[in-house]
């Protein structure tokens, strides 16, 4: 059953068990999964080798927007240059972008794989995946995909995350409280996994809601179901804000866990990682601003990919920034077996 505490049987540090994580009993992702057709034996990738975790992951995070070109001869040259770089750097793991973000706003305008909902910029993911498999030493390839940040064609007339001050701020994200949106998101993932035999999925850093979000009417209905009064929505300093944030975190992470459950129907040994904002690691109170937390992350994902980017966080002391992240991450993952630090190579 999705969204139950027993969804993943992981051995977690005491620091994780010590905190009570809410469970969203009536999560709509349950209905989405219940109504899905089960994959046939042919669709399930049974013959794929079992994914064994890599003791020391050496990762390249690749943005296909820089490989894509309308000139297909140039695009092939770009692919070959990428493969050569992978051969030179010798990573054992690749995080490979599967969505297109040409306007660089963090949301998917198009994708690099065939599907029924999003415009296809080019079926580039499959090409690059095949080249990596055939011509490099890489052991695992993860598809980097959004959970909420899908900008679908406007004629779909979908509901998006609303900011309390009006309109949309940050990434353009489908409201996670709308059943129709969840149906679409799951269908996009099903279209992807049936034709792209990846080892894992990296969930984008769009799995987040600020303390001003989601302010849509449907979101407010959920907040009331969780036991929060209208007063809390008008006062960001309300003492219940921290508890509301925990519920939003639980809702988002259990949504991602539901998607993972669907993917594993096709790829039983799939591994999943999530991008986490760095302030959440040393400052648990940041959960109110991001709806992300360390305990919930290690509950619902195989890996926590922390965006350890001091320039983005405007940190003056980069060494201290990194050491603080390591120290605090060890409170939840003592051996850092399930923690990834994504480093910023340029400002």
Predicted regions and their residues:
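Boundary/entry segment of secreted carbohydrate-active catalytic domains
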Residues: 24, 28-39, 47-78, 346
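Active-site-adjacent "subsite" loops/lids of carbohydrate-active enzymes
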Residues: 53-76, 140-191, 195, 238
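Active-site clefts of carbohydrate-active enzymes
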Residues: 62, 273-280, 329-347
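Catalytic domains of carbohydrate-active enzymes, especially glycoside hydrolases
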Residues: 77-103, 195-200, 297-304
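Alpha-helical scaffolding within the catalytic cores
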Residues: 81, 282-296, 318-331
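Aromatic-lined substrate-binding rim segments of carbohydrate-active enzymes
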Residues: 82-83, 100-146, 240, 244-266
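Polysaccharide-binding and catalytic clefts of secreted carbohydrate-active enzymes
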Residues: 85, 167-300, 306-312
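Glycine-rich, aromatic-flanked loop segments that form ligand/cofactor-binding clefts
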Residues: 93-95, 124-167, 202-208
């Amino acid at each position: 059953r999705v969204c139950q505490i027993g969804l993943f049987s992981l051995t977690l540090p005491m620091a994780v068990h010590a905190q009570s994580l809410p469970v969203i009993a009536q999560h709509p992702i349950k209905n989405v999964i219940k109504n899905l057709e089960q994959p046939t034996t042919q669709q399930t990738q049974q013959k794929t080798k079992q994914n064994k975790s890599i003791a020391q992951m050496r990762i390249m995070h690749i943005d296909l927007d820089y490989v894509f070109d309308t000139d297909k001869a140039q695009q092939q040259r770009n692919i070959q240059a990428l493969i050569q770089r992978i051969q030179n750097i010798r990573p054992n793991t690749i995080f490979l972008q599967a969505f297109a973000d040409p306007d660089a706003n963090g949301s998917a305008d198009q994708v690099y794989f065939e599907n029924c909902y999003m415009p296809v910029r080019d079926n580039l993911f499959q090409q690059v995946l095949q080249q990596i498999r055939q011509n490099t030493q890489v052991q695992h390839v993860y598809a980097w995909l959004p959970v909420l940040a899908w900008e679908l064609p406007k004629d779909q007339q979908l509901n998006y995350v609303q900011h309390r001050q009006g309109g949309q701020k940050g990434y353009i994200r489908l409201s996670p409280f709308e059943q129709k949106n969840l149906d679409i998101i799951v269908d996009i993932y099903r279209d992807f996994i049936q034709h792209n035999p990846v080892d894992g999925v990296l969930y984008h850093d769009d799995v987040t809601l600020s303390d001003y979000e989601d302010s849509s009417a449907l979101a407010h209905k959920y907040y009331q179901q969780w036991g929060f009064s209208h007063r809390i929505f008008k006062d960001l300093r309300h003492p219940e804000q921290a508890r509301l944030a925990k519920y939003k975190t639980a809702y988002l992470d259990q949504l991602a866990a539901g998607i993972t459950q669907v993917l594993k129907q096709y790829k039983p040994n799939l591994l999943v990682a999530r991008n986490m904002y760095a302030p959440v690691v040393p400052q648990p109170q940041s959960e109110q601003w991001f709806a992300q937390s360390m305990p919930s992350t290690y509950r619902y994902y195989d890996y926590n990919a922390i965006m350890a980017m001091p320039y983005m966080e405007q940190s003056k002391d980069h060494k201290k920034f990194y050491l603080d992240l390591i120290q605090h991450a060890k409170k939840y993952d003592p051996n850092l077996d399930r923690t990834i630090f994504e480093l910023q190579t340029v400002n």
